[in-house]
Swiss-Prot record:
Residues annotated as domain ACT: 14-89
Domain of life: Bacteria
Entry protein name: Uncharacterized protein YmfK
SUPFAM superfamilies: ACT-like
Matches recorded under Pfam families: DUF3388
Organism listed in the record: Bacillus subtilis (strain 168)
Length: 269
């Protein structure tokens, strides 16, 4: 185990912004890394003028020497040189960086054409053990529920709808014994639970919230308006839009008969 831990500490994320885009620039940087015996694990562009690399080396001194040499280069500007975070690994893997709210660091923004990146991001969160409360905002039919299910599959987790409108309106009021497994991903539709759920259903939601497992709440703003929970209880908030200028509103949730009018039928297990 010591060897594995040691190797993990010697992975680094290196990202730079191109100042002078000339032929052979990437080759020069690769040669520099080679001379310092630093291996390139993965490389990708993460923006029009930025490139990211996942590096691996044996000693911290190699990174210190690299850093000092990079400071003398006028053709690039180092933007990140650090132990890799989840967002760094995904940036290299997908070729784009996950947008993060400048004021609220636990809020991450995605667009519909980034569903692959979103699924990968959530799958990595789902793999982590213990309690996690994730909220996901977005307009109807933008792909919220489908992304949660796909992420569960990628993380080899079983997903369980506590409340949902994916196919037909589902409102659970009890679970069977094995459904309480902390290996499950529990999916709650904040609008369905608070607008249509019985007291038995809401009690079940409270039980699930206490489990050391992953819970994903769609429409978290409506959920916290009508329960004892607050947005501070959420570990991550994800926003999914059709386009960057789309405003996420809840006007569609104001009609009390909205699901009946849409042709949904309700199940209570």
């Amino acid at each position: 185990m010591k060897g594995v831990y040691h190797l993990a500490k010697l992975e680094w994320y290196f990202e730079y912004e191109i100042q002078v885009n000339r032929p052979g620039l990437l080759g020069d940087i690769s040669s520099l890394l080679g001379m310092l015996s630093i291996n390139i694990v993965t490389i990708n562009g993460v923006d029009l003028s930025r490139r990211g690399m996942l590096l691996r080396c044996r000693h911290i001194d190699q990174i210190k020497r690299l850093e000092s040499i990079l400071k003398t280069m006028e053709t690039i500007k180092v933007t990140k040189l650090r132990e890799p975070r989840l967002r760094d690994r995904l940036a290299v893997r997908h070729g784009r960086y996950i947008q993060r709210d400048a004021d609220d660091k636990k809020t991450f923004r995605f667009e519909r054409d980034e569903l692959g990146l979103l699924v990968d991001f959530m799958a990595e969160l789902f793999k982590k053990e213990g309690h996690k409360l994730i909220g996901i905002r977005g307009m109807p039919r933008v792909g919220k529920t489908e992304s949660i299910v796909a992420s569960s599959v990628c993380a080899s987790k079983r997903w369980l709808f506590v409340s949902s409108t994916l196919l037909k309106q589902t409102i659970r009021s009890q679970l069977i014994a094995d459904e309480y497994s902390t290996e499950n991903v529990f999916i709650v539709d904040g609008i369905v639970s608070t607008r249509r759920g019985s007291e038995r259903h809401l009690q079940l939601v409270r039980e699930i919230m206490r489990l050391p497992a992953t819970k994903v709440v769609e429409h978290p703003d409506i959920f916290v308006q009508n329960t004892e929970y607050t947005l501070d209880d959420f570990d991550y908030i994800i926003e999914l839009r059709n386009d960057p200028d789309e405003v996420i509103t809840y006007e569609h949730a104001e009609e009390p008969q909205m699901f009946d009018q849409s042709g949904f039928s309700s199940f209570d297990f």
